[in-house]
Structures are given as structure tokens and as C-alpha cells.
Amino acid sequence: MKVLVIGSVYPRFQEDAEVPWLRTSVAHLKKAGIEIQVLAPAYKGLKSHDIDGTHVNRFRYAPANWEILTHEEGAPSKMASKPWLQLLAIPYIINGFIQCLRICRKWRPDVIHAHWPFPHAYIALGAAKLFKIPLVLNFHGAELLLIRKKKWVKPLLKFAIGQAQAVFANSSFTAGKIKAIRNVNVECSPYGTTLETRDERRETRDDCHPGLVPGRETKEGESLPLASAANAASATPSSGDTPQLPVLHPVNSKFKILFVGRHIERKGIRYLIEAAKYLPTDKFEIRIVGGGDLTEQLKQQAALLDERRKTKDERDVILNEVKDPVNFSGVEESPASIIFTGKLSPEALANEYKTANVFVLPAIVDSKGDTEGLGVVLIEAMELGLPIVASNVGGIPDVVIDGQSGILVPEKDPVALADAFKRLEADPTLIENLLAGARKRIDECFTWDGIIERQIEVYKRLSRS
């Protein structure tokens, strides 16, 4: 079976870290016997090339110096900061449309799988209709945000959805947004971690949390929101045997709280920094990895908190500045320290995960209405053996079942964040139970074997019809 994968981004060279989940997806499809070609835009004149033995067809849409609409940053963000880039949208669609026709005429794929359907559904539609090739549209959430900004996008998406033979969404949250546009059947098809397999990285540790024992068995048969019972039964554990607890973490001198991600509004980092007010400095440390537009603003917020920590009367200062002191009754006299690491090498990032005690994603619905479509970073943190604290927004509840595979808290609630960290720090048994639940959740819903098996079932059904 042949599948043409279309997207706005694909690795430009072997070491490129762009869309690792899509690259991993392609690798697993090939491993399952599917022939793959990729269609993606050029970047600064980049010609067609091969990555991991997969041919990547690059379509040109502007002079080389202007071909910066995609890669390194999302196209919507780029167009917002550089409005002239919107002029490239028309040649982007036209040239992608032509290249798609050429590939399909010559290669004749059995299925076209288009990620980010606006605008890639329209790049694929001509070839799909002309050569009678089934079209799969794959939504990741970002394209749906455009509807709030540009009302004319909704009818275009509604039409495109109606032309597709199958629609994938990365979470039940995204699926609900799609159905609000057009009431069609939507397959929830999340993407798994891009980390190496559990067996490849597992090692025995003597300095782990007390009470954490590898090889703990878990119950089976729980109903799942992301898959039918049949699909759940077909999703095999990544190690091929009884689910095991992930890598265990040492007890540090301080309870280390780790955030990894872009410093943008919807990540809710400001509320994590506020949570430090409720965490004593002798017990807790917050480590913020990554960078972005809000980095300097967040550093200033943390620096102000640090100055308060250094003064004798910081508690009174904080209480006098807030409108509702009742909610700040738990403010610590010496708040937890906050460390910004910047962007890290893979080795340094791995060490951050290895020495952390909990992973946090304090996501919010931002001022643009955007939020987490799924939260793959949570799956990766689970795989690496970290208990999870995350906000109850977007697609996050598909990954984190409150009290089972992690702790969910209300968005924009620093007190709830701090309380969750304190619970985990004080209760190793709770951590053990959450890690066991996380392992089960991953094995049931987020293993690549299960994800790819379900995708191929859809491909085969469409090609037969």
C-alpha cells in the first residue's frame, strides 16, 4: 500500500528536530510495510531529498529568500509578526496543488493523508478527485483556531471535511471542535512519544523513591475515551509484556518541578511562577526549560518574586499587593526558587528529566482561544517516569485521568498547582500509584504499535471501498 503524507513541515536534514512525531509516525508506517512519500513546502530553496529513506517532495512557492512561511515557527505566528507573508499563501496552495497532481499521476498512492487541513486539504483535493484516491484529513487543533480570527475559514473547512473519506483528530477535544463545524465521524488518532523504547533506556537505580517497585501489574478492561474496546484490545504494550513502571527518579535534596516547552501564553507558565509563592524554598525548586516570546517577561516575574524572597517582609508585600488576600493565605515567607535553563541539548534535557521529581503543564485557554490540543510532552514525561500535574483544559484529559495517571487542576490556579506538588512530595505511595496508572494509560492508548495499527485499518478500509 502507498500513502502520500502532506504537511507544512518535515525535517529538512537528518539532525533537524522539526515535527519529530510525524517523522516517527512515517518510520512506523514504513516498518508496517506501507510505502510512504512526503509532500512538504521548500524552505529557502530546499530541493527534494530523502530523510530516513523516505522521499520528501519539496514544492517551491517563492524566491528562495522568501520561502520562510513554514519551519522553525508556526505559519500563523510568522504571518502575525510579518503580515507580508500572507501574500505567499496563494502561490503556496497553487504550487502545492500542482506538485500533488504530479506525484499522484506518476506514483498513484492508495491514500492521501493531509495534516493541517487548512490549507493542505485544498492542495490534496484536486489529485484526490481526479485520480479517485481516498483522502484522510488530520487535525491537530491549530487550524481550528483560525476560525476565531478569520470567519471565512469556517465554510472552507466545512467543505473540505465533507470531501474527505476519513477525518483524524489528535484528541477528543479537537474531535469535538471538528464536529461543531460539520457533523462527521472523527477517528481519535493521537501521536505517541518520540523517545526511545522503554527497554532501551530502562536501568536499575538504588536512589529511587521509596516504595516504587518495577514490574507492578495493572488491571485490564477499563473503558477508554480514545479508542473502542476492540481498538484497546489491539493496542499492544510497547515492550511486548506486562506493563512496567517507567524509569524511577531519585529523591533530590529539593523536590524538583520540571516544565519543558515554548514560553507562550497558552502554556500558563506565569501561573507556575505564581505557585512558587506557596512552596517553601527549602523543599521545592521549579525548573523552566525552553524559550519563546514571553521568556524575558517571565524572568522579570520570577525576579520580582526572588526579591521578595530575599527581603524580611516579603509576605506583607505580597499580601498588600493582591486584591483578594484570602486566596493568598498560604503564601510562604521564603518562596521556592525558580531556574530558567534556556534551550538545552538532548543530553542536558535528558538529565533534567532524570533528576526531576514531577512534570507540570499549567496550560490555559489563552486570549486567542488557543490551548493544548493533546499535550504529547505529557506522554513523554510519563514514559520517563515522572508523575504529572497538568491543567484540565483542551486535550490534556485524554492523557491525564485525574487521580489515575496524574493530577488535574483548574487552569490559572497557582494555589491548586502548589497543593498538588505538596501532595506528591509528601506521599511516595501516591507517586507509585500514578506512575502505574500512567504506564497503563500509555500502553492502552499511546503506543506507536496501537496508533499505527488503527491508522492502517482506516487506510485499508478506504482503499477497499
Question: Can you annotate each of these PLM segments?
Answer:
Residues 1-60:
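N-terminal subdomain of nucleotide-sugar transferases
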Residues 20, 255, 259-278, 293-296, ...:
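A conserved mid-protein helix/loop that constitutes part of the nucleotide-sugar donor-binding site
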Residues 37-40, 57-58, 137-140, 154-198, ...:
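Donor nucleotide-sugar binding/catalytic pocket of nucleotide-sugar-dependent glycosyltransferases
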Residues 299-309, 313-348:
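Nucleotide-activated donor-binding/catalytic signature segment of Leloir-type glycosyltransferases, i.e.
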Residues 354-369, 386:
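Acidic donor-binding loop of glycosyltransferase active sites
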Residues 378, 383, 387-390, 400:
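Short hydrophobic beta-strand element within catalytic cores of glycosyltransferases
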Residues 402-403, 407-414, 423-429:
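Conserved acidic donor-binding segment of nucleotide-sugar-dependent glycosyltransferases
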Residues 416, 423, 430-445, 454-457, ...:
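A short, well-ordered alpha-helix in the C-terminal region of glycosyltransferases
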